[in-house]
Amino acid sequence: MRKTLVIVGAGFSGTVLAANLLRSSPAQGADIVLIERNGAMGRGVAYAERDFPYLLNVPAARLSADSRDPLQFLHYAQARLPNVNGEDFLPRALYGDYLQEILCSAEREAPANARLLRVFGEVTGILRAAGGRPLAAQLADRAPIAADIVILALGNPPAPLPAWADELRGHSAFRQDPRDLPKTLSAEHSVLIVGNGLTMADAVSALSRHADRIPTLHTLSRRGLIPKPQTTFHANAMRGSGEALLAHTHSLRKLLRECRTLAREVEKLGGDWREAVAFIRNLAPSLWRQLPEVERRRFERHLHVHWDIYRHRLPPQLMARIETLRRSGKLRIMAGRIQRVIARDQQLQVSWRPRGGDNAASLTVDLVVNAIGPNYAIERSVDPLFVSLREAGLVSADALNLGLRTGRFGACVDAQGCASRHLYYLGPMLRADHLDATAAAELRDHAERLASHLADARL
């Protein structure tokens, strides 16, 4: 019998999965239903068209969405832009164009027994069907769609609303969405960006677009650490099995020491520490799964933020912009915690405690931007779909609140600890089991493996 596979979300993960399923659909034929709530297939939040050209954080030569053609995106970009090379950091909207073309191309070349159905709408729940197909996707504005398989291809969840911002909802000087920035700021204004990661860098880039109207920028996070810069290096230069690292998964301290030794050895040989990070990244899922839970918790408390700044890096031109702003006094990067924010007419007064200090400091700004990053704790999610999934017991959070518990190929683990045969997850919340699952190459590989599994499995 012809099968129906429903993919919820048409950002990177959902689009690449749909393209792979079109190329390798189950033998009995399949309807692949791709559902997107934001109005544009292939873009999601990350690659949406915006009035500011946000850059990709990875060079063009390392962003192919098809492992069979490693330079596919580079060739796509070179056909559309002048003088593009593999080391360039290109606009994210162009990558969204590329993903849309991948989907259209896969649809054109699909075998006769595979069909893509595009649906625009919001999925509010996944239902256990009473008969016939095992699941159904419930939508806000139309009848449920019955499915043999449902794949939750959901991207990064939005940032949580911090406790100090609870009374700032709707205030003109507060932005919960870091890309929803006012265009009326001038050099006389001041802005506090809460968070020092990649989202902060995007906000700094957008707020400093006009050289004569750059507001005074402050950024604040608990440790005051910012991402390291990207550079050109040979990602595949290091070879080996990683046995020395895998031998120390019983102890985080020993594992960290071995990682540092590896980075020093690379640099002694004239290499770049980024090569060591790339090597460790490839081993990260195995290392993470073998660490005892007590060591995982220690990593979360003390080391995850350090891993992130080395692992998730900035385009060199964006880092240069940040350094220029710091030297000019237009940007101040701070470490500490916000204690309270009070509205004073059109401004906000921020009381915060510097890291390592005993006394609170005060800062009055014209705008506060929440850039603290995604909220992976699904137990606290207020998204209607996750609330429904949680209440139905179809999904469960991992012990560290890093994302979703999953089995092989991303099969969702339910509240009873059983891996589903019909419900899968593909996206950054795989980090619970893999530590990292946000880069395009990682999600591409997950998508290809899942598509191959679904094509071979007896649905």
Describe the predicted segments one by one.
Residues 1-39, 45, 82-458:
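Flavin (primarily FAD) cofactor-binding/catalytic cores of flavoenzymes
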Residues 36-81:
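Redox-cofactor-proximal catalytic regions of oxidoreductases
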